[in-house]
Regions:
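Non-globular targeting/processing and membrane-anchoring segments
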Residues: 1-110, 127-133, 137, 143-242
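Catalytic nucleophile loop
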Residues: 108-125
Length: 242
């Protein structure tokens, strides 16, 4: 990418003010979309799901950890059962996202719990989490229907193929890598009212782009993102380390 043009301060200020107007317009549009997201209707979750964490088996309601709101990031796992024979580790793109998650205290203060969920044995998850040094609670949905019902694991013997609200025919045209026997990533949101749990929102693909903290910083600089999200390696594999 070429460097920006060098101009006089007056020309820079005029260009910056023009951009500011566009930024404010985009902010107002995003505010409206965010409000519409919050106003989405919700559906009650009636199926019993079992997860495994460090302390043993837990339910979906347990994942809230006493709070009213729950965000689950569907962390894709790379192993033979998801189309990656010979591997047993987390997805590097999902790892890039989780690298940007900091302390969770502010979320907790807003009655919101954030967890990671993967369709992998808990022993594999714990080994990879230790390697990466993350503190975000992480649960296994292995042998559970949760991933399938959230449309991030695919088995046409269980459910018709669907990802990002597209059916099999649309996926064959736009995302042929989504097929039976594979996994993908996404995020789902739940609300708890007493003992009742409701699903309010799920996003997939570019829908979780806004959660990529590194990109939010890179979008401020002239060189921009520089790499596609799939081109970022595990952070401990940079050679030499940045």
């Amino acid at each position: 990418m070429d460097n920006p043009r060098v101009v006089a301060p007056e020309e820079w200020l005029a260009a910056r003010k023009d951009l500011l107007a566009r930024e404010k317009e985009a902010t107002r549009a995003k505010d409206a979309v965010d409000a519409a997201r919050r106003a989405l209707p919700m559906t009650e979750v009636t199926k019993d799901y079992t997860f495994t964490g460090r302390g043993g088996q837990v339910s979906l309601a347990d994942l809230f950890d006493g709070r009213r709101q729950l965000i689950t990031y569907h962390f894709m796992w790379r192993h033979a059962e998801s189309g990656f024979p010979g591997e047993d580790q987390g997805c590097p793109t999902c790892s890039f996202l989780v690298d940007g998650i900091g302390d969770l205290s502010h979320l907790h203060a807003c009655d919101t719990t954030l967890v990671l969920v993967s369709r992998a044995p808990i022993a594999s998850i714990e080994r990879f989490q230790k390697r990466m040094g993350w503190q975000v609670p992480w649960y296994s949905s292995y042998r559970s229907d949760f991933n399938y019902d959230c449309h991030v694991s695919f088995d046409e013997a269980k459910l018709p193929l669907e990802y990002n609200y597209k059916d099999k025919a649309a996926l064959e045209r736009t995302a042929p890598f989504i097929r039976s026997g594979t996994d993908a990533f996404g995020a789902s949101v739940f609300l708890r009212e007493g003992d009742r749990v409701f699903h309010t929102y799920s996003a997939y693909g570019r829908g979780v782009d806004q959660l990529l903290a590194t990109y939010r910083w890179l979008e401020l600089v002239p060189l921009g993102r520089q790499r596609h999200v799939t081109e970022f390696p595990y952070r401990d594999t940079y050679d030499p380390q940045p």
